[in-house]
Amino acid sequence: MTLSLRSSGAKLMVTVFAFGACAYVTYRIGAQAYVGWCIKQSTKTSLDRALALDPGNCGAEYRLGLHYSFVLTDLDLKRGQELLRTAVRCQPLDSQYWLALAATLEASGDLPEAKAAAQKVSALESHNSVLLWRSGNLLLRMGQLPEAFDLFHRVIEGAPEYLPLVFSTCWKSTGDGDLILHRAVPDTVDSDLAYLDFLSLAQNLDLNALQTAWGRSTGSEQEEPTGKNFDQVSALIRSKGTPEEIHAWDKSVKAALQPRLDEAEKVWDRLLALGEEFDPKKSFNFFQSLLEADRPQEAVKAWDKLVARGILPRREQHLSNDLIVNGGFEAEPINGGLDWRIYPVGGVLVTNDRENRVEGGRSLSVHFEGLRNLDFKHVSQFVPVKPNTVYYFSAFLKSRALSTLSGPHFEIYDYWDDRRDERTGERKVSWKTAEVLGDTEWTKYQLTIHTGPKTDLLVVSLRRQPALELDKRIQGTMWVDDVRLSTIPDTE
């Protein structure tokens, strides 16, 4: 059917209708744009205008609810909750709306409803680590630790960069290490290693508690040292404190670290139970903390578990109870734990040598380039021992063109006995082999060591003390092989 508009009246009506429709559409578009602009402004006045123009606008109700809930000058929790409840009914799948409602309910003391709203976030979100983190913290403030830790577990799975923050937050909220380990920390190699590292480092201890313990132990009335972090406070005490204050600080740190290391050992066992390969170097802070917390035998047990798993090579045991790890340098030293620690220093080149050796496949070569009068102590190993015990040390050394007034030698000392000679600054209690000088063939050097009543950790160090004349540099090469420490005399 064809509609004919021949009369001027009909044409006018159509024109008016079309114009009105266009004007209405233009108005609605403009109004919506204005509403959007008002919402973005997020002031109370602009949000009121937005709702006046568009009643029931979810975004406006949400932002106005936030305003009444958290802007102190306009605080009205009841009104804020009403608006946020309307917003979640309007947008029931928006996690941010539920999180805001949970926060305002928690602020007003309605904990059951706040918990239910926070749990809505966890039900809706699977990958948004930011919202899961906020929801978990909200549950934490309400004392819902298991539920909060479950959310932190999911946060770590989706965003590993949250690991240190999660660990720190959990330990500030509770001392229940089992709850943290089993609810917050994913049972994976990376998570367990990161948590092990966190527990092992003194830098992650409660700084305020440490400062308080230090103040009590010193009995000092002076103000506690202030700093932004552990390292700053520790450095301040060491630079300005008396020997007694420094000792008290070390004692406070050691005491605070003990319960953390109890938990770290549980993490270690769980990590090994996974049966997966990992880089042992990532666990070295754990071993170092065990040693420095005066738990050397536990370090041995943890090390032996790595060996049993095949992650580390088995000890070269020429004697049935040889305590030196990798004494023949057959495996590459890994610079940590109970293995050799070889640190770089200018003017010295430390390498493995397959040509010069006593037995096995190689030895350790140390070449001094003659650049300076060097204080060399850059090859060492921590060795857990027993108090009041006789040990027999031996090592083979060789040298070529080693010119110096002060030659290299092995020095063994009690890690905890730091008493020093006032004149030389050297340790009062240590055992030293004869110095190596000039050209020598492989020669066996031996020591008999009687540990004291408190000695449980020795340091075996390749040492060269500076010559008294400053211009007497050291030049030449020495080799080391077949280093041993045992309670049985070496008769070979």
Where are these regions (language model features)?
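N-terminal leader/linker segments that initiate helical-solenoid repeat arrays
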Residues: 7-81
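Extracellular and organelle-lumenal recognition/adhesion modules and their flexible linkers in secreted
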Residues: 9-23, 27-28, 32-36, 161, ...
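Structural signature of tandem alpha-helical TPR/SEL1-like repeats
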Residues: 36-48, 72-86, 107-120, 142-150, ...
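Canonical positions in the second alpha-helix
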Residues: 49-50, 86-87, 120-121, 155, ...
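Structural marker of alpha-solenoid helical repeat scaffolds
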Residues: 53, 90, 124-125, 158-159, ...
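TPR alpha-solenoid repeat register
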Residues: 60, 97, 131, 162-166, ...
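Residue at a conserved register position within TPR or TPR-like alpha-solenoid repeats
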Residues: 68, 105, 139, 169-170, ...
